[in-house]
Amino acid sequence: MVKTQILGRQIIKVKHVSVKEFEANPSMIWDYDVMMHGTWDANADNVLNDNAVNEIAKYIDAGKGVLAGHDSVGFSMGTTLGLSKIADKFNIKRGLWNNAIQNGYDINNS
């Protein structure tokens, strides 16, 4: 039995790119509908540089998709590192971790 392919469906192509490679050429994301960043716990302390974050912000503004790992926005990144700089684009409220304010936002008092 041959499955009929419907254009734009059932096609998932994944290309693994290192953080260094992405930072050197962040415009590569425009070749894809969705980009993903941050699969390791605490993202293995890989923080994207400002050039990469700015390109991702434009990508989101253009309606493209970004899937971010749970520690790549917030946690120890605060509001000044990596994707946390554009956390508002993800509609994420960041809060407390082990009773220590990581980023100046107390979710319990919002």
Identify the function of each model-found stretch:
Residues 1-41, 77, 96-98:
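Aromatic-Pro/Gly-enriched surface loop or interdomain linker
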Residues 41-110:
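A glycine-rich, often tryptophan-bearing local segment used as a flexible ligand/cofactor-contacting loop or short
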